Amino acid sequence: MKLQRTLAPTSAPLSLSNLLSSLVGLLGGRKGRERLIGELQAKFQARGVFLVSSGKAALVLILKALAAGSERRRVIIPAYTCYSVPSAIVKAGLEVVLCDVNPRTLDFDFPELERLLDEKVLCVVPTHLFGLPADVRRVRQLCGVFGITVVEDAAQAMGAGSENRLVGTEGDVSFFSLG
């Protein structure tokens, strides 16, 4: 695999038609919201879609829901990720556990991830950083031994795919961000 040495852009130019379309969506009210939810459910074959203000807000809600009624308090994340991820874990009252990443893929260092997994881990958050698909199947396989939930962070990768699957469709729960 060739090592990518450029960073993805952090923004894209918006045309006047893009801006006007967003206003139509805002003014569309409930119908527009329901239409968006339906389209997202169809695209990602999701049982449920919830719209919240940000990826961080989504992750906090997911973590609080998972932690309710569980003694597990550790959340494993890649050591190289967006600041919002560990920030959300702390906001949810949980413990951040960092796992080294493979510098070629920016995915977990899988031998280290395997060593970190135990009955105290609530969930593992594979991250599709810069739109590069993480190996969620491998994470699920390792987590299955301990009954650990996989929370797929697709905040930077909506629409990206791997092996004929869209990112955000392999975790037990997933979240995206449009901002």
List the predicted regions and their residue ranges.
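Conserved donor sugar-nucleotide recognition element shared by glycan-biosynthetic enzymes
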Residues: 33, 55-59, 81-82, 106, ...
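Conserved PLP-binding active-site segment in aminotransferase class I/II-type PLP enzymes
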Residues: 1-70, 92
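Active-site phosphate-binding strand-loop segment of PLP-dependent enzymes
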Residues: 104-179
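A short beta-strand submotif of the Rossmann-like class I SAM-dependent methyltransferase core
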Residues: 51-54, 77, 126
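Conserved beta-strand segments of alpha/beta enzyme cores
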Residues: 48, 95-97, 149
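Conserved PLP-anchoring active-site segment centered on the Schiff-base-forming lysine
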Residues: 62-116
